[in-house]
């Protein structure tokens, strides 16, 4: 079971995802499921440029995921914005982070993929810490046992 976590800090998680459970609630739920042997992990996406794409945030999410029993973390160090969703996102940016819309427009224009200037460094930090803590950066997929022909007698 995957849990989306993009902010280690509850105050920022509530700001970026109004109406969704705070990150600490997600980690508590993950820990409860992992303790029962359920395969759990984190989808750490999107990391919004200029908001939550910091080394401190990434490291804190990885450490909290480890503590909660996560088996894997799948990251995306940026955000994708299609036409239509971009306008909605920009309006939400202006409400939640006044002045940031102009920076997004200047940095990313109408690009679909919007990656912050430190995305490569964040990816390195993420992969090194996951390796150190023994957290996979890929998800194991369920593979059913191969079918066998039944005999009639």
Task: Show which residues each predicted segment covers.
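Conserved AdoMet/S-adenosylmethionine-binding subsite of the radical SAM
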Residues: 1-114
């Amino acid at each position: 079971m995957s849990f989306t976590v993009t902010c280690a800090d509850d105050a920022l998680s509530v700001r970026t995802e109004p109406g969704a459970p705070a990150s600490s609630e997600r980690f508590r739920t993950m820990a409860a499921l992992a303790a029962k042997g359920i395969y759990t992990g984190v989808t750490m996406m999107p990391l919004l440029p200029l908001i939550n794409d910091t080394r401190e945030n990434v490291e804190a999410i990885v450490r909290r995921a480890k503590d909660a029993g996560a088996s894997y973390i799948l990251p995306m160090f940026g955000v994708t914005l299609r036409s239509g969703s971009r306008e909605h996102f920009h309006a939400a940016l202006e409400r939640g982070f006044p002045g940031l819309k102009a920076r997004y427009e200047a940095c990313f224009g109408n690009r679909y993929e919007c990656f912050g200037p430190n995305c490569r460094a964040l990816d390195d930090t993420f992969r090194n810490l996951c390796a150190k803590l023994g957290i996979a950066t890929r998800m194991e997929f369920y593979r059913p046992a191969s079918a066998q022909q039944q005999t009639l007698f």
